[in-house]
Amino acid sequence: MIVFIDTEVNPQTKKVADYGAMREDGAVLHSHSKADFDAFVSRCDTVCGHNIINHDLKYTALRGNYTVVDTLFLSPLLFPQRPYHRLVKDDKLQVDELNNPVNDSMKARDLLNDEIVAWNQLTPNRQKIYYLLLYGTFEFGGFFKYIRYSANQSLLGRIVGVQTDWAQLILKEYEGKVCSHANFDMLVKQYPIELAYSLAIIGADDIFSITPAWVLRNYPQVVNVMNLLCNTSCGDCGYCHQRLDAHCGLKEFFGYDEFRIFDGVPMQQQAVESA
């Protein structure tokens, strides 16, 4: 059974002043007592909330082997396109009533339900990419466990440890949207979360969609990953030829076939290519 939680913390004492929780069975708790909160949550195996990994779990000190689902980390992955989810503004929940942890718990429940719907609307290949990138992380692993998702792989493949062909897997979903010769294996190994968030934005197909500020604060390498995927030309693939080639851009945006030459030097072309 899952329980949705939220806490109000006194900024001076750094202690919980108010606990709110709502269980899957409909039971609701609003209390100042940690003992009451612990007893209420103990009947569940999964704990969910918004930003509970970096906030609520630190103050509640829950004891037990709970599966943790944090709707904060899921939101940029599953709602990358404008308009963003109505319940989320940057890293905060949009709530109707301030300082009401029960209300916030209910909002977290609603958000998780919408995130599950959004997950089910992804293509099977995109689901597989996100899962293989993120299932081993604390931020996302609990979500996959809760929805009982695992990427299909044969028993023989698991036994012999077949390695994922990341270039093939990603390009199957994002062909024409990223450089075909990007170092996917390196990105997967060093920046799995950053890569997932980058692919979410790329897959949104909306040039005005942006990565939330809190993501950039916590995962600043997202900028570097995006540059490696979309703004670093290999000079030898369809994406780079169409999107990053200076002559193609000149023709597409201005209708000219060649850059002007000044004293035998293509200064305009050099300026574009060095930008």
Q: Residues of each region from the PLM?
A:
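Two-metal-ion RNase H-like nuclease active-site motif
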Residues: M1-N10
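Conserved DEDDh/DEDDy metal-dependent 3′-5′ exonuclease domain
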Residues: T13, G20-W119
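Conserved pre-motif I regulatory segment
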Residues: Q242-A275
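Interdomain "pre-motor" coupling segment immediately N-terminal to P-loop NTPase/helicase cores
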Residues: M186-G255
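Short beta-strand micro-motifs in enzyme catalytic cores
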Residues: V3, K15-A17
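Acidic, Mg2+-coordinating catalytic module of metal-dependent nucleases/exonucleases
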Residues: L87-N183, Q190, E194, P266
